[in-house]
């Protein structure tokens, strides 16, 4: 591939969340600070929402890496769980051993509470992180509320952080789980990066991957990258990776406007926007030509 060609140790624009590549934008740092403060308070639910590709999974991984050894984190990435399966997953994360085929739900819940009390007495705080929560069944979200009832006289035994797309809000408005929504103490909505942050984001990821040379992406390339990806981190990564492949295929050491354009045209989710952009550009050019012709003919004298 292009690693040796560009002097890189690893791929700089992988879409797999890797906290070594975490880039602190104004939005992501504020969200991380909110999560860290909320986790230390130990009260209620925490909700993080954002459109596809805005960095929810990366933020979740960064949070888990940032929590001190006082915390025990249970990470549940699979949202398609019924309540019983949720309890089994949580038990596995908490290192509780029992026969999942024979134990009843109330017994599993009791075993979880006993384990939580033991961890609490040893000075541990428990944080449960659930990804893609918008896909969770209503009854599983209600089971989460039941878990949040586990507490001592002074504090909750576990903190629940749910990450999801904006549709999660619609699900939380369901009448049967209105009590869960009332328990959300902190929430934050992730937005795409700012246009002025993309240049630094690209350079940051290249540097982490081992690049030590001069600017690799030309200014026209960055301009088109911002325009076509709307500064959504996942789309930026996908297009930047393909643009590097294009540059490598042409035997160059930098990424040009045309490399980004080729990358965009190779990305299905951006093709429709590209077609609309070209049609709009042609329409503007046509209207401009007609206007100049009318001026030349003296229609505006």
Locate each region found by the language model.
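Conserved NTP-binding/hydrolysis module of P-loop NTPases
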Residues: 11, 70, 84-100
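Residues at the beta-strand->loop junction immediately N-terminal to the Walker
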Residues: 47-49, 130, 226
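Mid-core helix/loop region of P-loop NTP-binding domains shared across ATPases and GTPases
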Residues: 82, 98-143, 152-156, 194-198, ...
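C-terminal alpha-helical "lid" subdomain
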Residues: 212-213, 218-301
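Walker A/P-loop nucleotide-binding motif
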Residues: 42-62, 79
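A short, basic N-terminal segment
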Residues: 1-42, 289-301
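Sensor-1/coupling segment of RecA-like P-loop NTPase cores
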Residues: 47-53, 104-107, 134-143, 148-176
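Helix-loop-helix "sensor" segment of P-loop NTPases
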Residues: 93, 117-121, 127, 150-153, ...
């Amino acid at each position: 591939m292009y690693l040796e060609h560009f002097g890189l140790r690893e791929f700089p624009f992988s879409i797999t969340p890797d906290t070594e590549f975490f880039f602190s934008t104004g939005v992501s740092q504020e969200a991380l600070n909110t999560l860290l403060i909320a986790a230390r308070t130990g009260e209620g639910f925490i909700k993080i929402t954002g459109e596809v590709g805005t960095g929810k999974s990366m933020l979740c991984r960064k949070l888990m890496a940032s929590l001190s050894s006082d915390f025990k984190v249970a990470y549940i990435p699979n949202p398609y769980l019924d309540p019983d399966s949720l309890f089994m997953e949580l038990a596995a994360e908490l290192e509780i051993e029992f026969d999942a085929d024979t134990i009843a739900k109330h017994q599993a819940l009791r075993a979880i509470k006993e384990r939580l009390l033991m961890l609490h007495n040893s000075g541990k705080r428990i944080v449960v992180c659930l990804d893609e929560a918008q896909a969770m069944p209503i009854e599983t979200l209600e089971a989460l509320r039941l878990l949040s009832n586990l507490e001592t006289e002074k504090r909750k035994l576990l903190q629940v952080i749910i990450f999801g797309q904006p549709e999660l809000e619609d699900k939380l408005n369901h009448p049967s789980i209105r009590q869960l929504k009332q328990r959300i103490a902190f929430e934050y909505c992730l937005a795409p990066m700012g246009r002025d942050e993309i240049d630094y984001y690209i350079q940051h990821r290249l540097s982490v991957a081992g690049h030590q040379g001069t600017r690799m992406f030309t200014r026209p390339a960055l301009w088109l990258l911002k325009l076509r990806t709307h500064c959504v981190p996942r789309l930026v990564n996908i297009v930047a990776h393909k643009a590097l492949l294009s540059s490598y295929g042409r035997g160059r050491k930098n990424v040009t406007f045309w490399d980004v354009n080729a990358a965009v045209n190779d990305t299905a989710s951006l093709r429709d926007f590209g077609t609309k952009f070209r049609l709009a550009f042609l329409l503007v050019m046509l209207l401009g030509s007609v206007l100049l012709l009318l001026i030349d003919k003296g229609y505006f004298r």
